[in-house]
Regions:
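Catalytic cores of nucleotide-sugar-dependent glycosyltransferases that transfer UDP/GDP/TDP-activated
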Residues: 1-591
């Protein structure tokens, strides 16, 4: 071949090479533009849905509030009427019974006149009142957290989730909280200060408190703000101070004083963890004969590990008798006999004790040695109930989730593949719906977790691994929707609720720890666990990650059947958790 021909041939090759490069660059550019367009469409979708929600909320506020909010606000207005001496306790109780009657459309009647002054509203209440039948339980939570107003751990989600579920089933629920300086008031509607001080007992004398009321998700909330002891709740953190006993015993006593002053006569006073356990002995030793003869006490424990052990003489601060309570069958600590145990007070003095656990049975909890309460729990075992936590199925539902590029359900799973590809794009992973995607989602509050995950990513050096060390609401929804498998440190996850949400979104929850899998073989022959624990043990507990991947690859029909079945199960707050609580309320009201 001549040199000219060789030169011409080489020129053609370089020309083809440059054209190929240009084509690759063009395709990459088009890919980037397509991704940007997809991201833009998703952002517009979220923005549009947010706008629709905003318009619907505005329309709701401008026309008529929902019946729960109207009822809650009306109850708080009645409290204010009692505190300002407009009405007496007896008439207030009659009005509350009227509101509780689900057969009376009181929300429709009062929605247009809630703006009126208390004196005018009272005239309407008296005009409207008549024969009514009480159809549900009246429950007052005395607690230290409520989502989204003040959230530290699982208690906040529990109080809000359970309260909303109870109200949807026809029960009346109220919440009493300390007025912390760090409250998130964005979701508190109609926040107002009651124009009257009320006094509560502490450390030998009466002290003034300022009362605030508002409505959170249709639930009436009362905030108690100490005046003399203003430093108790004007701090940065909620817990962790040397005088936590003083802070929360003040609040517990003030809550009871407020309930009596406002003339409330609830069916159940629902107290939580050690922080409000002192309500138990206070109720039976001081308050039961002040119009609360028909009220019963329910204690819920999110955990038995935090108990608050104190000097007996401190009980006198809130009006209790240290000598009478410092006994082994009452508040005396089981191990440090010179001290009193505040959580034990709640167990001993409550009519029912609910322990929140997804997987443990009553027998396992009683026989655990780590909490030191086993003698007390054994004595009071007949009042113990175990309930699994739920989750908010209205916020975590792939069929209507506004954060997803395409919605899907157990009846139509097509959208899940689109969610997986979208997640892969977001994380810069290879985009292919058939690639198995498994995720570990944990809490940054777990000691050393971030460091361990960063080390794991560095050691693995795998282009298909991503570590994200901050929470993003939209991404959390997409991760659940785009994953095939969710690796869970535990199925007893009361904070992030990953196993519950994973099943809802069609991702298989798999335990990280083989020890936890082995514990799934333990069966309490005397006391059965929850429906949730039974379902999880039968379907997911004994499946290691390798087996799950093998099943997904080689037996997809079996995998799909299992996933779809899990998606159809209802493990929300409205289901088993709420039913267990209603049964417990019914049991103690019959005592």
């Amino acid at each position: 071949m001549r040199s000219g021909e060789l030169e011409e041939k080489g020129t053609d090759i370089w020309k083809l090479f440059r054209e190929a490069q240009q084509n690759i660059l063009y395709l990459n550019k088009q890919r980037i533009m397509a991704k940007e367009e997809l991201d833009r469409v998703k952002r517009e979708k979220i923005s549009l849905l947010d706008r629709i929600e905003q318009l619907e909320r505005t329309k709701l506020i401008n026309t008529r509030k929902d019946k729960f909010s109207i009822s809650a606000e009306l109850l708080l207005r009645i409290d204010a009427m009692v505190l300002t001496s407009l009405i007496g306790s007896k008439e207030a109780s009659e009005f509350r019974r009227l509101i509780m009657d689900s057969n009376v459309s009181i929300a429709d009647y009062f929605s247009e006149i809630m703006h009126k002054q208390d004196t005018e509203l009272l005239v309407e209440l008296r005009h409207f009142s008549g024969k009514s039948r009480k159809s549900g339980y009246h429950v007052i939570h005395v607690c230290t957290e409520m989502a989204p107003v003040v959230s530290v751990g699982s208690l906040a989600l529990y109080v809000t989730g359970l309260s909303r579920a109870l109200q949807r089933k026809g029960h009346l629920v109220e919440v009493i909280l300390p007025k912390y300086a760090s409250l998130n008031l964005n979701e508190v509607h109609g926040l107002r200060e009651v124009d009257a001080e009320f006094h509560s007992y502490f450390n030998g004398q009466l002290h003034g408190n300022r009362i605030w009321t508002g409505v959170v998700y249709g639930i009436g909330v009362t905030f108690i703000e100490p005046l003399y002891y203003s430093s108790f709740f004007s701090r940065e953190n909620i817990y962790g101070y040397s005088n936590d006993f003083e802070r929360f015993s003040y609040f517990s006593r003030a809550s009871l004083d407020y309930i009596v002053k406002a003339g409330k006569q609830p069916d159940v006073l629902h107290i939580h963890n050690w922080e409000t356990s002192i309500v138990g002995p206070l109720f039976w030793d001081v308050f039961v004969n002040q119009g609360l003869e028909g009220t019963r006490i329910m204690l819920t424990c999110q955990s038995l590990e935090s108990q608050c052990v104190e000097q007996p003489e401190k009980l006198a601060l809130c009006g209790l008798d240290p000598h009478g309570l410092h006994r082994s069958d009452r508040l005396q600590d089981n191990h440090k006999s010179h001290l009193v145990n505040v959580l034990k007070a709640g167990v001993v003095y409550s009519n029912k004790v609910i322990i929140m656990s997804s997987m443990q049975t009553k027998g396992q909890i009683i026989n655990a040695t780590i909490h030191g309460l086993e003698p007390t729990l054994t004595i009071h075992k007949d009042k113990l109930v175990v309930a699994p936590p739920g989750f908010d199925s209205s916020a975590w539902d792939p069929s209507v989730d506004k954060f997803l590029p395409q919605n899907y359900s157990a009846d139509n799973m097509k959208g899940k593949s689109a969610c997986k590809v979208s997640l892969q794009q977001h994380l810069g992973l290879q985009e292919q719906a058939s690639i198995i995607l498994f995720v570990f989602m944990g809490s940054g509050q777990t000691p050393g977790l971030n460091t361990a995950m960063e080390y794991f990513e560095e050691e693995l050096k795998d282009e298909n691994t991503r570590f994200l060390n901050k929470y993003d609401e939209a991404l959390a929804h997409l991760v659940l929707a785009g994953s095939d498998i969710m690796l869970c440190p535990s199925f007893d996850d009361t904070v992030l609720q990953v196993p519950l949400k994973a099943m809802r979104y069609g991702a298989m929850p798999i335990l990280l720890n083989s020890t936890d899998r082995k514990s799934g073989h333990f069966v309490d022959r005397d006391l059965e666990g929850s429906k949730f624990s039974g379902y999880v043990k039968d379907n997911f507990t004994n499946i290691p990650l390798s087996q799950a991947i093998d099943e997904l690859k080689n037996n997809p029909s079996k995998w799909d059947k299992k996933i779809v079945d899990a998606m159809t199960k209802d493990f929300s707050w409205d289901a088993e958790c709420c039913d267990i609580h209603i049964s417990a309320y019914a049991a103690i009201k019959n005592l």
